[in-house]
Design a protein with these regions (language model features):
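Canonical P-loop GTPase G-domain recognition
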Residues: 112-136, 140, 335-396
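Pre-Walker A (Motif I) flank of P-loop NTPase domains
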Residues: 13, 194-199, 375
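Extreme N-terminal, non-catalytic leader segments
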Residues: 132-198
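Cofactor-cradling patches in redox/metallo enzymes
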Residues: 15, 22, 29-134
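Conserved Switch II/interswitch segment of TRAFAC-class P-loop GTPases
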Residues: 74, 297-301, 310-327, 337-338, ...
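Nucleotide-state-sensitive switch-loop elements of NTP-binding domains
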Residues: 171-196, 207, 216-317
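Hydrophobic positions on the alpha1 helix immediately C-terminal to the Walker A/P-loop
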Residues: 212
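ATP-binding Walker
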Residues: 23, 204-207
Length: 396
């Protein structure tokens, strides 16, 4: 069979992917999201066993074009209909819903669901006829519409923390900067006296930044029941296809709260750790009067200090596996970071690592009169519940 060419989207398409609630079968959605991503789409992946409310809230906060769900657990009629109803109820009926579930979803049920308003449910026959890439081409083509090409009165709804308004202004700034220019100017004026702090979290890829952010958010929400938190999480775009896997939400368990707004951004440029729209996104969330805004970059290299331009206080996350101590002398962030977390502290050699990093931090910051043990370097295990190192870092 001849290999099909991927459809090339005309707009920046963002799609939320997940496997349905009580569904542990994530092999299918993983294959689909990889093909969707290689077709040039920014994929916000949630993993498996995700509730309708979680998926819908994500799609609204992320201003997605569509939702793609696999459902192999038999509850698809209720799941998809409830998702359609909830999107309508929340005023986000423009978000399209696609699904699939192999032979679990009967042909008669597919007809019923599509009549109800689901954009398309793919059957095994579609896979045979169209091929995998053909199905994804159809999905992406139907989801390929502009978002943010016009703004109405969104700015008036920011202070109500309306996720649709926040999301739409950020999308407009990303996709149609000319359309958003006037609104952003007004937002800058609004924010002149805004003092919401912006902690920036950066570090190497795979160091556990998202898990660490999740732990900080969980502690913040339980310590301050009245306060709200905004998150901006950046992941890299692929240079070859323009697609991106915005996968930070997979690790976030504490963000499903009405007090949290999270937005994932793709860098949309290669070899940089931040999107050039980060500053605008921060301003929009500040205007929505969130009490604290956490900015998380994509994985960075040794020489990257981009986060410093956007944050008030910076945390550098690394692991004990940095090689020889001389490698630390090359890491630019150790010159600038206010705090350093050595995550995955249960790995071998962690105690030697923290000693070396503390000494390097002392050298870089010329803190010769302070005991190296007092340097703001913390050993953390973000994947462990109530980890003492995480507690110490949070209090710092």
């Amino acid at each position: 069979m001849e290999q099909q060419k991927p459809y090339i989207p005309n707009n920046k398409v963002r799609i939320v992917t997940a496997a349905a609630l009580f569904d542990g079968h994530d092999a299918a959605i993983n294959i689909m999201r990889r093909i969707i991503q290689s077709t040039g789409v920014e994929v916000i992946h949630l993993g498996h066993d995700r509730s309708v409310e979680e998926v819908v809230n994500t799609a609204i906060q992320e201003d997605a074009n569509a939702i793609a769900i696999t459902s192999y657990q038999g509850g698809h009629n209720e799941y998809f209909k409830y998702m359609y109803d909830l999107l309508q109820e929340k005023g986000a009926g423009q978000i399209k819903i696609f699904g699939g579930g192999g032979g679990v979803i009967l042909p008669s049920e597919i007809v019923e669901l599509q009549a109800y308003g689901i954009t398309r449910i793919y059957a095994p026959d579609d896979g045979r006829e169209l091929g995998l890439q053909g199905m994804i081409n159809d999905l992406v083509q139907q989801s390929d519409y502009a978002i943010g090409d016009k703004l109405t009165d969104e700015i008036n709804h920011l202070e109500d923390k309306n996720p649709k308004a926040i999301a739409r202004i950020i999308s407009s700034a990303e996709n149609f900067p000319d359309v958003a220019a006037k609104t952003l100017e007004d937002i800058h004026k609004k924010n002149e006296n805004n003092t919401s702090p912006v902690p920036g979290i950066t570090g190497t890829g795979g160091a556990g930044k998202s898990s660490l952010v999740d732990e900080l958010v969980r502690r913040f929400l339980s310590d301050f029941p009245e306060k709200t938190i905004g998150l901006i999480s950046v992941d890299p775009s692929k240079r070859k296809t323009g697609g991106a896997l915005l996968g930070d939400r997979i690790r976030m368990n504490a963000i499903n709260s009405p007090r949290v707004y999270m937005r994932s951004l793709a860098t949309r440029q290669s070899n940089l750790a931040l999107s050039k729209y980060v500053a605008d996104a921060i301003q929009v969330i500040k205007a929505a009067k969130y009490d604290i805004i956490i900015l998380e970059t994509s994985g960075i290299g040794q020489s990257d200090t981009e986060i410093m331009d956007h944050s008030d206080v910076s945390l550098y996350v690394m692991t004990p596996e940095f090689g020889a101590a001389t490698q630390l002398e090359k890491i630019d962030m150790l010159d600038f970071a206010d705090l350093v977390a050595i995550n995955k502290f249960d790995k071998r050699g962690a105690l030697d690592a923290i000693r070396d990093v503390k000494k390097q931090y002392q050298r870089n910051h010329n803190l010769w009169d302070v005991n190296p043990d007092e340097m703001p370097v913390f050993g953390t295990i973000a994947s462990q519940f109530n980890d003492p190192g995480m507690n110490t870092l949070y209090k710092a």
